[in-house]
Design a protein with these regions (language model features):
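Active-site catalytic loop in hydrolytic enzyme cores
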Residues: 100-170, 174, 244, 255
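Active-site regions of metal-assisted phosphoester/phosphodiester hydrolases
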Residues: 9-13, 124-128, 152, 179, ...
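Short, conserved catalytic or adaptor-binding loops enriched in Gly and charged residues
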Residues: 8-11, 81, 151-153, 208-211
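Soluble catalytic regions of membrane-associated enzymes that act on cell-envelope
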Residues: 3-121
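A structural signal for well-ordered alpha-helical scaffolds and beta->alpha junctions
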Residues: 36, 145, 199-203
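Residue-level marker of positions within ordered structural domains that often coincide
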Residues: 9, 22, 157, 185-186
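Residues that flank catalytic or metal-binding motifs in active/ligand-binding sites
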Residues: 13, 101, 148, 222-224
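CN hydrolase (nitrilase-like) catalytic-core segments centered on the catalytic cysteine
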Residues: 66-90, 97, 158-159, 163-249, ...
């Protein structure tokens, strides 16, 4: 992905991120049989990827037998490919094993960690106005108060993750990360006209609330329209337009 160097200070190939817009892949005719093979082909065509980041999605989940099978197959495919030895993964699951919340699953080498969604929509994502216990087979999720979300390192840069609307609520304990990844699914809010502006405004607000010290925010959208916002408040429109039609895209960053 080429950028106009006269307009920003970002160079190429410091951190290379492969963005996977899961919903758009299937909307464009992709299928569960070919999904991982298509991703591998994309990585082969775009060498030196440091991280692969999935959108929030409704495909990979442990809440139904069918989706659990897809989730377990994805994890096994990653393990068999051995990609996690050189590429860090930021996956997205609706529930993970018995952990009944929307999560980011970080995998790199022998390290794994779950970051959970901290802002659940009442009566839709959680049972009522307050946080209540729900098992993995429930249609609802729960927040685990004792679970600690953490930040990560990609090469020499710090990376924080948020899940969709989480990024619109200021964290009590700030993690000043250089890169913020937001795994989103705004499909329910897509009413046509104004949807592009909504994604822009949400990303600006996320930067204001949680990323004022960050170099870049990447708001990964499930059905396309991923927003890359730099520290000078400039959005990369080339990436945004490309991401509307291509499920897999590359974002090259220099965090120096």
């Amino acid at each position: 992905m080429k950028h106009d160097e006269s307009k920003n200070t970002f160079k190429h190939n410091n951190i290379r991120i492969a963005v996977v817009q899961v919903g758009l892949y299937f909307e464009k005719g992709g299928n569960t049989t070919d999904f991982f093979n298509d991703l591998i082909k994309f990585i082969d065509k775009n060498p030196d990827v440091d991280s692969i980041v999935f959108s929030e999605n409704n495909v990979f989940s442990f809440k139904t037998p069918y989706n659990k099978e897809l989730a377990e197959k994805l994890l096994q495919d990653i393990k068999n490919s051995n990609l996690q030895q050189k590429i860090s993964f930021f996956l997205s699951f609706n529930g993970y094993k018995e952990f009944n919340n929307v999560v980011t699953l970080y995998i790199f080498k022998n390290n794994t960690h779950l970051n959970q969604k901290k802002a659940l929509i009442p009566f839709i994502e959680k049972r009522g106005l307050f946080n209540r216990e729900s098992n993995i087979n429930s249609v609802y999720y729960q927040i685990y108060d004792s679970h600690v979300n953490k930040s990560f390192r990609v090469k020499d840069s710090s990376v924080s993750t948020f899940i969709c609307y989480d990024a619109l609520f200021p964290e009590v304990t700030k993690k000043n990360s250089e890169v913020i990844l937001i795994q989103s699914n705004y499909r329910l809010l897509d009413k046509g006209f104004g949807h592009d502006k909504l994604k822009y405004l949400a990303t600006y607000l996320a930067r204001f609330l949680n990323g004022m010290q960050s170099k870049v925010i990447i708001n990964i959208q499930n059905y396309g329209g991923t927003v890359v916002l730099y520290d000078n408040w400039r959005i990369n429109n080339d990436i945004y337009e490309k991401s509307k039609n291509e499920p897999f895209i590359i974002v090259d960053l220099d965090i120096k």
